[in-house]
From Swiss-Prot:
<dbReference type="InterPro" id="IPR037163">
    <property type="entry name" value="Spermidine_synt_N_sf"/>
</dbReference>
<keyword id="KW-0745">Spermidine biosynthesis</keyword>
<dbReference type="InterPro" id="IPR001045">
    <property type="entry name" value="Spermi_synthase"/>
</dbReference>
<dbReference type="InterPro" id="IPR030374">
    <property type="entry name" value="PABS"/>
</dbReference>
<dbReference type="InterPro" id="IPR029063">
    <property type="entry name" value="SAM-dependent_MTases_sf"/>
</dbReference>
<dbReference type="InterPro" id="IPR030373">
    <property type="entry name" value="PABS_CS"/>
</dbReference>
<feature type="binding site">
    <location>
        <begin position="140"/>
        <end position="141"/>
    </location>
    <ligand>
        <name>S-methyl-5'-thioadenosine</name>
    </ligand>
</feature>
<feature type="binding site">
    <location>
        <position position="33"/>
    </location>
    <ligand>
        <name>S-methyl-5'-thioadenosine</name>
    </ligand>
</feature>
<feature type="binding site">
    <location>
        <position position="88"/>
    </location>
    <ligand>
        <name>spermidine</name>
    </ligand>
</feature>
<protein>
    <recommendedName>
        <fullName>Polyamine aminopropyltransferase</fullName>
        <ecNumber>2.5.1.16</ecNumber>
    </recommendedName>
</protein>
<feature type="binding site">
    <location>
        <position position="64"/>
    </location>
    <ligand>
        <name>spermidine</name>
    </ligand>
</feature>
<dbReference type="GO" id="GO:0008295">
    <property type="term" value="P:spermidine biosynthetic process"/>
</dbReference>
<dbReference type="Pfam" id="PF01564">
    <property type="entry name" value="Spermine_synth"/>
</dbReference>
<feature type="binding site">
    <location>
        <begin position="158"/>
        <end position="161"/>
    </location>
    <ligand>
        <name>spermidine</name>
    </ligand>
</feature>
<keyword id="KW-0963">Cytoplasm</keyword>
<feature type="active site" description="Proton acceptor">
    <location>
        <position position="158"/>
    </location>
</feature>
<keyword id="KW-0808">Transferase</keyword>
Amino acid sequence: MSHQETWHETLHDHFGQYFTVDNLLYRDTTGQQDLVIFENAALGRVMALDGVVQTTERDEFIYHEMMAHVPLIAHGGAKKVLIIGGGDGGMLREVSRHPGVEQITMVEIDAGVVTFCKQYLPRHNAGAFDDPRFKLVIADGVNFVSQSSEKFDVIISDCTDPIGPGESLFTSNFYQDCARCLNEGGIFVAQNGVCFLQQDEVVNSHRKLGHYFSDISFYQAAVPTYYGGIMTFAWASQNPALRQLDTATLAARIDETALTCRYYNAAIHHGSFALPQYLLNALSASR
């Protein structure tokens, strides 16, 4: 790619987005995936895997804040957190902002993603890879949870879309193993695509999670990079009360954590579980 060449995302047929490549920083096959990192005047540094944008400097905070703080604040006392994926370090950065968390394990299938993101996307991790609570495991997340005897309070599946290496992170076996690896009162959350364009993905996750969790829902956030509507996150636990905390309780926990965010707050947390009617209809029809 040369200066001002355009890069086109290939996630959806017949519809997509493009970026101008103002400065190509890296492109290669890591051994697992095709990785490209470039600079764009509108969104800063952009990372894509296998033709799909994973993160940009400009708006990554929305995604990472919502994936990390919604389950951690709702739990209210998480000590051990498992991140599946998350090689760019953004999820680790947000989880590490919770002083009550004592152990953060991140399982990333591709060591190359971690290495290159440390070099080319340093703002994402903001030094969190050096946190003494952090442990990096280079392994397949599916295999890790299937073989693990550890228990966690929160599991965050910061997965790619269900294509390539990320496909196995949307299977019934993976969800079953995650449920087994949670402590009592634990919460599982996962990236679940843009529901307007990827509704089947949400419906399938809802159906599969229902076999292993008694409370399944979804929450949403507006992340500009993930075009086509509102970003959807799966939520699963055995306790519906964790999903129904009022804004006063959420605000008190946020204050106690001394958490200051750019997107996430108590009202956003509470309101993010309100879903559009077309998605509610689809979920109801799938039961």
